[in-house]
């Protein structure tokens, strides 16, 4: 599907969404849950497996023998030990957990990378991205499908330049990831806020007032009463979003809204795994300590079978 087809589809989806005025649009970027399992090690280590590996990868370990599981875990530990000092710290484990949870992002980047690295030099320049994404627009600057492609291209170029740390208009894979998924990078958060404000700020005064805030998430349907969640959002705006009580949100207030400082579940899980596995209590883990507790980190056919026995007995 090319960009034109995608945007036409997006237009239809948008129109469909607007026809459902009680549906709420969520602009807030939350950290994803580490697992949808209950975190209760007395019952099972399923939560820990999902957190450490990601839910999909965790399923593959359930098919392995204990020996295979330990061998594969040992290889993972070598990747987690970023400074190669033979130990895994809480910070290294936290970084790994965050990577495992966001593996889908890197898979998305890999898919898009192949379509934009046109000269296959391991980099994506702005020219390559522009030509691959907007090439036909340059040939036909006034398409009749209602989208302002030039404006979209200007916005993309601004974001590309922000992601491009060294300013050479050529993105490494990490910079390209920041371009495609800016909410995942601290240095890109200002552009996320700026783009959000541009989307919502209809009168162009550089702020988001109450009506713009509500109008972005709710399309009023004639004489129908507002749903309760809209009334709640009005109260949220007045009581919490508009911190200085001037009737509108500035950049900092918008940032606090869409990029909240959530509880760091990855760090909490990393500390839990270290605490449970650290046999000599030195605050860090060796490969041997991790592999000895393989059932906590990754599981196998044996741990899965044991869990099944527990559930059968309970039944």
UniProtKB/Swiss-Prot annotation:
The keyword Cell cycle does not apply. The keyword Protease does not apply. Ca(2+) 4 binds at residues 201, 203, 205, 212. Residues 68-103, 104-139, 151-186, 188-223, 229-264, 265-300 form the EF-hand domain. Residues 1-19 form the signal peptide. Ca(2+) 3 binds at residues 164, 166, 168, 175. Ca(2+) 2 binds at residues 117, 119, 121, 128. Glycans are attached at residue 131. The modification Phosphothreonine is found at residues 65, 254. Ca(2+) 6 binds at residues 278, 280, 282, 284, 289. Ca(2+) 1 binds at residues 81, 83, 85, 92. A motif (Prevents secretion from ER) lies at residues 312-315. Ca(2+) 5 binds at residues 242, 244, 246, 248, 253. The modification Phosphoserine is found at residues 44, 69, 261, 277. GO terms for cellular component: endoplasmic reticulum membrane; extracellular region; Golgi apparatus; melanosome; sarcoplasmic reticulum lumen. Belongs to the CREC family. Interacts with GGCX. Interacts with RYR1 in the presence of calcium ions, but not in the presence of EDTA. This is Calumenin. It comes from Oryctolagus cuniculus.
């Amino acid at each position: 599907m090319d960009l034109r087809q995608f945007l036409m589809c997006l237009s239809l989806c948008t129109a469909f969404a607007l026809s459902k005025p009680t549906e709420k649009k969520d602009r807030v970027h939350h950290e994803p849950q580490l697992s949808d399992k209950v975190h209760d090690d007395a019952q099972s280590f399923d939560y820990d497996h999902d957190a450490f590996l990601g839910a999909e990868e965790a399923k593959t370990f359930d098919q392995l023998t204990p020996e295979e599981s330990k061998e594969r875990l040992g290889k993972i530990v070598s990747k987690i030990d970023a400074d190669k000092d033979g130990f895994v710290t809480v910070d290294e484990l936290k970084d790994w957990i965050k990577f495992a949870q966001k593996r889908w992002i890197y898979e998305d980047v890999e898919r898009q990378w192949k379509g934009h690295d046109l000269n296959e030099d391991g980099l994506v320049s702005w020219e390559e991205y522009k030509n691959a994404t907007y090439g036909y627009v340059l040939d036909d600057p006034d398409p009749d499908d209602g989208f302002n492609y030039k404006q979209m291209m200007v916005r993309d170029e601004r974001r590309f330049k922000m992601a491009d740390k060294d300013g050479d208009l050529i993105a490494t894979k990490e910079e390209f990831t920041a371009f495609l998924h800016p909410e995942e990078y601290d240095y890109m958060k200002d552009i996320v806020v700026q783009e959000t404000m541009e989307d919502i700020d209809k009168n162009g005064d550089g702020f988001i007032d109450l009506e713009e805030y509500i109008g972005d998430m709710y399309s009023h349907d004639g004489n129908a009463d507002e749903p309760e969640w809209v009334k709640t959002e009005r109260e949220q705006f007045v009581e919490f979003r508009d911190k200085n009580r001037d009737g509108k949100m500035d950049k900092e207030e918008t940032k606090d809204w869409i990029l909240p400082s959530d509880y760091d579940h990855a760090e909490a899980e990393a500390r839990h795994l270290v605490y449970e596995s650290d046999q000599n209590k030195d605050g860090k883990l060796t490969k041997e300590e991790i592999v000895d507790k393989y059932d906590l980190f990754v599981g196998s056919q044996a741990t899965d079978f044991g869990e099944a026995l527990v559930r059968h007995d309970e039944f």
